[in-house]
Amino acid sequence: DGAPLTGRTITFSQYKDGLVRGGGLDRNAELIVRRDLGILPPEELERRCRSLGAELLPSNADFCARFDFAPRYPVWLKVWFADEEFPASGRLLLDESAPHYLTIEDAVTVGSLILDQLTGAQHWAV
C-alpha cells in the first residue's frame, strides 16, 4: 500500500497476528545467534552477511546488518557477541511498517531464509 518506513523496529512476535508464528521465529533466531552466529569471528559474520547483500550499520549492538529483502522491507540482524560473562545474543528485527507488505507467514519465511543462508543449514522448517 506504499506505507513509508517508520524507522522504528519490531520483533516478529509484534507483527500483526504474529504472537504464535512470529514468536517462534524470534525464539529460534535468538537460539541460532547464541549457538551459531554469535560465536563466529566478527569478520566471518560480516562476510556471510555481505554475501547476501547486507549493509553493515552502526548500532547499539556489537554487530548490525540490514538485509533489504524487498523495497521498503528491510530486516535487521543485531548481534551481541559472547564474552567471558555473557553468551552471545541477538535477534532479527523488522520495520514497524512491515505488516503493510507481507503477512506474518511470509515474514517468517523471509526471516528463516536469512537464518538458513547465514548458517548454511535449515534450522527452521517453513
What residue spans do the PLM features occupy?
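Long, Pro/Ser/Thr-rich low-complexity/intrinsically disordered regulatory tracts in eukaryotic proteins
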Residues: 6-12, 61-63
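Negatively charged, low-complexity tracts enriched in Asp/Glu with abundant Ser/Thr
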Residues: 15-62
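Conserved aromatic-histidine-acidic binding/catalytic patches
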Residues: 21, 33, 65, 98-102, ...
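Long, compositionally biased interface segments
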Residues: 96-126
